[in-house]
Every structure is written in C-alpha cells, then in structure tokens.
C-alpha cells in the first residue's frame, strides 16, 4: 500500500512534502522539469535532485521559489552506503537544508552538507582523483589492475574507512 499509481503529474504531486527528481542527465530537461514540478506542488514542498552533474543553482533557474530546492547525492548501493551529500544552491534557504538533513537522519542516512556547489561534489572528486592516479600507474606498467585492486582493498580502503582521509 506504499505505492500509488497516478494518472497525471498533478495527481502524483498533490500533497507531497518532498519531491525527488531523477530524470535523464540533461540540464535543459531538468530545468524544465523543476519548473513543471513547481506548478503542481504546495509552497512548502521541497524539491531535490540526485544528480552530481549539474548545480542546483542552474537546475532551479526557472523556479519561482528556488529557496526550496537542493541536491541530495546518494551513493550506490544506497541500502549499504549510508552517506548522502547535501548540496544547496546559491538561493537555497538554510531551513530547506535543515529539513532535508533531518529527514535523511530519520531515514538512517548520514547526511554531509557541503558549504557550496562544486562540480562533481566532494566524494566524486576525491574518487576521480584517486582513479586518475591508479589508471596512470597501470598505464605506466607499475602494477596490473588486479594488483592495484588488491593493494588498495587491503590497505588504503581499510585505513580510509577507519580513520578518514584527513
């Protein structure tokens, strides 16, 4: 009874307190979707996106109330990885951030708010920096893919999980 099939967007959004956008990665499509969502929701409803491809400031450009929009960046598999990055846009209200953080905590997640938008957000940037270095090491013949995976899995991965990077 937790899933309801609706015939229209208006019906689906009626009474919603939080709406999550997760459509194809296309900025113009997302900008249009945020404006369309806003036409059907209550003035207190929060609108979030899970993308790390675009800043909320751009996606909410056509919204009348961009103060209630932000990014929440979940990680796969979400039932195992507790972290969710919370990234406000330039016009996101602090009250919106606070409500979303409280909801995420209530859902058993570990929200980490970022202070400002940055391409790729925090975790993706760190992960990609490490990936670039590991691919370079493999390309230069320092170690094979299997050896690199073994070395990282049984050293840095454990240390990072236990102590954090800083």
Model-predicted regions and their roles:
Residues 1, 93, 143-147:
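Helix N-cap / loop-to-helix initiation motif
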Residues 1-47, 53-55:
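Rossmann-like NAD(P)-binding element
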Residues 6, 27, 31, 53, ...:
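Electropositive phosphate-/nucleotide-binding environments in soluble metabolic enzymes
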Residues 29, 95-106, 147-150, 154:
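A non-catalytic, amphipathic alpha-helix used as a structural packing/dimerization or gating element
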Residues 30, 79-80, 130, 162:
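N-terminal alpha-helical segment
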Residues 37, 100, 134:
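Aromatic/hydrophobic pocket-lining residues that form π-stacking "cages" and hydrophobic walls in ligand
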Residues 49-125:
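Rossmann-fold dinucleotide-binding core
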Residues 117-166:
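Helical "substrate-binding/catalytic lid" subdomain
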